[in-house]
């Protein structure tokens, strides 16, 4: 596990402990489980991706991200609601919203604002280590959570997945290498993200997705993440029968993120 990932996970553990002191898991869980209207308002994350792909289009998870540990501030003029609206207008299937405060300058409020601005399903993009965070995510309006295999053992991953599924949420499991893929394939979720960024070196290569593809069962929906910068990158993936993408920085650096999405996939 990389030093930066270790550091993030340690901070996450402190954050969750502090949150539980402010509000207990039992209290949060009872509120979420009692809110029938919120459950009825869940948006179908996987369904939105598959619907786009079935129509011959790319299934794009468009990310709303202000900053990152490796790049610093990515988008100084940061208006989550406007970005979400632009993404929806230009054909995104789903949104991914960073909620990590310390390392990515995200916020739960950004997720709420983005979801309120459009009808797209929303992923809480964060480092999930405790069921408490899943109940948080649902209370904020998230429809899907992310599990990063590099930071979790199988028992905890299975527990977190089961918690999300009980709440009607989808789960995107993220891998970077063969060992992580083996662990991910033990889960029930069909959403499999391949991160082309090495979390140890932060180097990126689309070859990561291409190398792992032959080992991924056909029922899994493969989502290639990071390193998609040009239309040629998109073509390379689609020629390999990868039609789902999670893209953040490329869109965030453009004057209009939605128009950049349209340019990249036109």
UniProtKB/Swiss-Prot annotation:
Against SUPFAM superfamilies, the record matches this protein to: Ribulose-phoshate binding barrel
Enzyme Commission number(s) of this protein: 4.1.1.48
Q: Report which reactions are catalysed by this protein.
A: 1-(2-carboxyphenylamino)-1-deoxy-D-ribulose 5-phosphate + H(+) = (1S,2R)-1-C-(indol-3-yl)glycerol 3-phosphate + CO2 + H2O
Q: Quote the Pfam families the UniProt record gives.
A: IGPS
- Keywords from the named record: Amino-acid biosynthesis, Aromatic amino acid biosynthesis, Decarboxylase, Lyase, Tryptophan biosynthesis
Q: Molecular function terms in GO for this entry?
A: indole-3-glycerol-phosphate synthase activity; phosphoribosylanthranilate isomerase activity
Keyword Lyase in annotation: yes
Query: Organism's domain of life?
Result: Bacteria
- What Gene Ontology terms for biological process does this UniProt record contain? L-tryptophan biosynthetic process
Pathway involvement of the protein, from the record: Amino-acid biosynthesis; L-tryptophan biosynthesis; L-tryptophan from chorismate: step 4/5
Entry similarity comment: Belongs to the TrpC family.
Tell me the protein's name.
Answer: Indole-3-glycerol phosphate synthase
Protein source organism:
Herminiimonas arsenicoxydans
């Amino acid at each position: 596990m990389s030093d930066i990932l270790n550091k993030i996970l340690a901070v996450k553990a402190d954050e969750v402990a502090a949150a539980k002191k402010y509000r207990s898991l039992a209290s949060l869980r009872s509120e979420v489980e009692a809110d029938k209207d919120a459950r009825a308002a869940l948006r179908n994350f996987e369904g939105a991706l598959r619907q786009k792909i079935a129509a011959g289009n790319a299934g794009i998870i468009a990310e709303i991200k202000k900053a990152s540990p490796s790049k610093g501030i990515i988008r100084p003029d940061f208006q989550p609601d406007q970005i979400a609206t632009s993404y929806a207008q230009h054909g995104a299937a789903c949104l991914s919203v960073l909620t990590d405060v310390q390392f990515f300058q995200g916020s739960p409020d950004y997720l709420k604002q983005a979801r309120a601005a459009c009808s797209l399903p929303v992923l809480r993009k964060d480092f999930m280590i405790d069921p408490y965070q899943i109940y948080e995510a649902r209370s904020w309006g998230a429809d899907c959570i992310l599990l990063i295999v590099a930071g979790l053992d199988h028992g905890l991953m299975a527990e977190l997945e089961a918690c999300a599924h009980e709440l009607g949420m989808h789960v995107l499991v993220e891998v970077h290498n063969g060992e992580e893929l083996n662990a991910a394939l033990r889960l029930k979720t069909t959403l499999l993200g391949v991160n082309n960024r090495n979390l140890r070196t932060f180097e990126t290569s689309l070859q990561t997705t291409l190398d792992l593809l032959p080992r991924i069962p056909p029922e899994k929906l493969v989502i290639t993440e990071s390193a998609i910068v040009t239309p040629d990158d998109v073509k390379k993936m689609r020629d390999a029968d990868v039609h789902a993408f999670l893209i953040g920085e490329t869109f965030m650096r453009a004057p209009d993120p939605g128009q950049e999405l349209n340019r990249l996939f036109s």
